C-alpha cells in the first residue's frame, strides 16, 4: 500500500507527481500526473474510499478497474496502475489532451461528414473490441468519448459495464436517458450488445447534426419519444448515412443493426483504416518486446531477468511491469496514429526517406541541421507535420559548424534513458518541459549558486540525433529582456539558434555504449558580457561532468 508524499509542494503518489485538476466526478477528482522518471503524462482518477462505501458503489468501481485492466486498444483509455492508500484509490490512466467529444460538438457544432465517419469508425472499433471480450459498455455518450491531440477518439468510463456471458441477459437500467435504448428505459430484458449499438447511433447522429435525435427536458416525454423511435433527419444528410442511422435506431432490438451490419454498410466502409478491424486481432498478444525491456532496465537500473520476472508474475502493480506497459503503449500510440494518417495524407520531405521512422512527440528537427528536402507546404494537412514546428522559412539557412552536445544514432528513447541515468548519478535536479526537452540545474558546492542549462534532443537527419546543451543564465536573460525571469519559466528554455561568441574548441569523441559521440563547442548567447562568478566555467564543468558520465 503506497503513501502520499510531497514533491516541491505537490502531492506525489508512487512514481507520479500530481498536477492540475482535469475534472470532478461523483466519487472524486481526476488530476494530471507525471511519471518522475519517464516524464509521461497520465490522468489520475482519485476515488475516496469512504465516499465509495457510503454510495454503495464498490461493485461499480471494481468492475471499472477489472474491465480497464483487460483492455489494450488504440481507442480505449488504458488503465496503467491502481495505487491504494488508507483513504483513497488512485487509478493511473492514459492521458489525452483534447477533452470530451461532447464539449467539442458544443463548441464547433456538427462535424463534417468525412470527419464524423472517421471518428465513428474508431468508436465502433472500440465497441467491437469490448463486445468480443464479453463486455458491454452500457453508458456510451459523447461525454465518455475523449479526444487526443490528433483528434482520435478514446472511449472512457467503463464503470457501468457488465461482463456478458452466453445466454445471460442484463436487467439493470442504467446510463443516461438521452442515449439509452428503448428496452433499457422500459425495464425489459436485453442481451447487452444491442444497447451499445443504439447509443452509437445517437452519437453518430450528434456528430452529423450537432443535436440529439431524442431530447426533451420533461423526462416522461423524452421516454415517449425514445419508445416511439421517431426522429428528424435533416435534408443535408445523404441517403446512405440516413439508412444506417435508421437501422441503428430501430426500436425493436431484434431488427436493430449489429456490428457486422454496420461494418458491411457502404457508408461505413469508405476510407476505413485496416488497423481498426484486423483479420487477425493482435491487440492483446503476449509477446515480450526486447527493446522495451532494455529501456526499462536502463531507466530503473535493473536487470532483464528482473523485468521478465515482473512481467511473468502477473502482478499489475509491479513498478517494472507498469513502466514496461507505459513504454509499449506510448510507442504504439505514435505508430498507430502515423499509420492511419499517412494513409490519407503522406508527409513531405525527409519523412518519406525512411518509412520506418516515426518522430515521437516533443522531438524537433535541429533548426540548423534541417535536411534541404524539408520545405514549408502551403498548408500542413498531416498531423505529423505539427511535430515539425521548426521548419525553415528559407532553404538558404546557414548551417552552424559547432555545437555543444552529444550526437548519436541510438533511438531517442534510449538516448534520454541514458541522460536520466547520468543526471540521477550526478545528483542533478531537472524539470521536464517535454519528453525530449529538460531544464537542469546543479548547486555549486563552493559558491552555493545554481548553474542551469537546457537539454534538448534534436533530429539532425534520418538516423542521427543531437543532444544540445545550452546555458541558462537568469541574469543574462534579465539583461536581454529588461526584466527578471522566474526560475521555472519555460521562456528561459526557448529555442535560439546557437551562435558562438567564443573560440570553438573540439574535444576527442567519446563513446557511449558504442553509439554516442560527443563534441564540445561554445553555445553562449552573444553581446552579453560575462558576469562575475564564473558562470561560463561552471556551465562547462557541468557539461563535462554529464558527458563524462554518459561516456562510461
UniProtKB/Swiss-Prot annotation:
Region (AIS): 291-376
Post-translational modification as stated in the protein's UniProt record: Ubiquitinated. Phosphorylated at Thr-172 by STK11/LKB1 in complex with STE20-related adapter-alpha (STRADA) pseudo kinase and CAB39. Also phosphorylated at Thr-172 by CAMKK2; triggered by a rise in intracellular calcium ions, without detectable changes in the AMP/ATP ratio. CAMKK1 can also phosphorylate Thr-172, but at much lower level. Dephosphorylated by protein phosphatase 2A and 2C (PP2A and PP2C). Phosphorylated by ULK1; leading to negatively regulate AMPK activity and suggesting the existence of a regulatory feedback loop between ULK1 and AMPK.
Biased composition (Polar residues): 480-490
Sequence segments annotated as region (Disordered): 478-519
GO cellular component terms attached to this protein's record: axon; ciliary basal body; cytoplasm; cytoplasmic stress granule; cytosol; dendrite; Golgi apparatus; neuronal cell body
Pfam family name, one: AdenylateSensor
Modified residues (Phosphothreonine): 172, 258
Enzymatic class: transferase
A GO molecular-function annotation: ATP binding
Residue spans of biased composition, Low complexity class: 509-519
Protein kinase domain span: 16-268
Major localization listed first in the record, in broad terms: cytoplasm
Activity regulation summary: Activated by phosphorylation on Thr-172. Binding of AMP to non-catalytic gamma subunit (PRKAG1, PRKAG2 or PRKAG3) results in allosteric activation, inducing phosphorylation on Thr-172. AMP-binding to gamma subunit also sustains activity by preventing dephosphorylation of Thr-172. ADP also stimulates Thr-172 phosphorylation, without stimulating already phosphorylated AMPK. ATP promotes dephosphorylation of Thr-172, rendering the enzyme inactive. Under physiological conditions AMPK mainly exists in its inactive form in complex with ATP, which is much more abundant than AMP.
Kinase as UniProt keyword: yes
Highest taxon in the source lineage: Eukaryota
Enzymatic reactions: L-seryl-[protein] + ATP = O-phospho-L-seryl-[protein] + ADP + H(+); L-threonyl-[protein] + ATP = O-phospho-L-threonyl-[protein] + ADP + H(+); L-seryl-[acetyl-CoA carboxylase] + ATP = O-phospho-L-seryl-[acetyl-CoA carboxylase] + ADP + H(+); L-seryl-[3-hydroxy-3-methylglutaryl-coenzyme A reductase] + ATP = O-phospho-L-seryl-[3-hydroxy-3-methylglutaryl-coenzyme A reductase] + ADP + H(+)
Domain notes: The AIS (autoinhibitory sequence) region shows some sequence similarity with the ubiquitin-associated domains and represses kinase activity.
PANTHER family assigned to the protein according to its UniProt record, in alphabetical order: 5'-AMP-ACTIVATED PROTEIN KINASE CATALYTIC SUBUNIT ALPHA-2, MAP/MICROTUBULE AFFINITY-REGULATING KINASE
Record's function text: Catalytic subunit of AMP-activated protein kinase (AMPK), an energy sensor protein kinase that plays a key role in regulating cellular energy metabolism. In response to reduction of intracellular ATP levels, AMPK activates energy-producing pathways and inhibits energy-consuming processes: inhibits protein, carbohydrate and lipid biosynthesis, as well as cell growth and proliferation. AMPK acts via direct phosphorylation of metabolic enzymes, and by longer-term effects via phosphorylation of transcription regulators.
Subunit structure: AMPK is a heterotrimer of an alpha catalytic subunit (PRKAA1 or PRKAA2), a beta (PRKAB1 or PRKAB2) and a gamma non-catalytic subunits (PRKAG1, PRKAG2 or PRKAG3). Interacts with FNIP1 and FNIP2. Interacts with DUSP29. Interacts with ARF6. The phosphorylated form at Thr-172 mediated by CamKK2 interacts with ACSS2.
Name of the protein: 5'-AMP-activated protein kinase catalytic subunit alpha-2
Organism: Sus scrofa (Pig)
Organism phylogeny: Eukaryota, Metazoa, Chordata, Craniata, Vertebrata
